[in-house]
A protein has these predicted regions:
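Residue-level marker of regulatory loop/turn positions in helix-turn-helix DNA-binding domains and
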Residues: 88, 109, 141
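Short glycine/serine/threonine-biased micro-segments
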Residues: 46-47, 105, 165, 187
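Residue-level detector of anion-binding/catalytic polar loops
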Residues: 35, 105, 182
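N-terminal helical cap/lid subdomain that shapes the substrate entry/recognition surface
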Residues: 2-94, 100-102, 113-115, 123
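Asp-based, Mg2+/Mn2+-dependent phosphohydrolase catalytic module
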Residues: 1-4, 40, 97-100, 114, ...
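Hydrophobic residues in well-ordered beta-strands that form the structural core
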Residues: 16, 108-110, 185
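Generic enzyme active-site microenvironment
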Residues: 7-9, 109, 166-167
Length: 223
């Protein structure tokens, strides 16, 4: 079936948001007179959300006293500084342009709350180009449930089989597959060292956004 839309996960797929997360975590350590930790320790936990990143930042059990206060502080800081260093991954700008030139649409389906996702999209000039932005605020069940992808296809009035969903986590692939879309896993994203995208069951696995452009060359999802 002809490919008519490409939907992206946000963090680790469409956007490199790690620099903002890392800056906040390192600043929180510095203010507590703690030395910086390897950025990779934080980056590896991004897919696990604020809870996982704070736990890694302070080597702290989430059940420990004071953890929730640290997590809330992290979220407050991120609300203020969520779009300072974030940017499109290398090659993604060209991919988005190719999608638009092929008269297809693209959008974002993320587990990031809209209070963070919308400002980032606006700051990067992507909000007006994107056909939609689906966040947990818009659904009852987030990924890996298929509801966000089902909603996206319904909003676009497209058969899920004509949609490609791109993500850097198993939950993205599960959500897309269960919604009936084609799926692509990206190895350049925020993947935990213990995880392997080759085992997720995606229709295609890529190392760079440029590899997805091959799918657009003939506008047929042959993945």
């Amino acid at each position: 079936m002809r490919l008519r839309a490409v939907l992206f996960d946000m963090d680790g797929t469409l956007l490199d948001t790690a620099p903002d997360f890392i800056a906040i975590c390192q600043a929180m350590r510095a203010e507590r007179d703690l030395p910086p930790i390897a950025d990779k320790l934080i980056r590896d936990e991004i897919s696990g959300g604020a809870r996982a990143m704070v736990a890694a930042t302070f080597s702290m059990n989430p059940e420990a006293p004071g953890f929730e206060a640290q997590r809330l502080e992290f979220l407050e800081r991120y609300q203020r500084d969520c779009a300072v260093h974030s940017k499109l991954f290398d090659g993604m700008a060209e991919l988005l342009t190719d999608i638009e030139k092929a008269h297809m649409v693209w959008g974002v389906v993320t587990n990031k709350p809209v209070r963070f996702a919308q400002p980032i999209m606006e700051k990067l000039g992507l909000a007006e180009r994107s056909a939609l932005l689906i966040c947990p605020d818009h659904v009852t069940h987030s990924k890996p449930d298929p509801e966000p992808l089902i909603l996206a296809c319904k909003m676009l009035d497209l058969d899920p089989a004509s949609v490609l969903f791109v993500g850097d986590d198993l939950r993205d692939i599960e959500s897309g597959r269960d919604a009936g879309t084609k799926t692509a896993a990206v190895r350049y994203g925020y993947i935990h060292p213990d995880d392997n995208p080759n085992h997720w069951g995606a229709d295609v696995v890529v190392d760079h956004p440029a590899e997805l452009r091959k799918v657009l060359d003939n506008a047929v999802c042959s993945c």
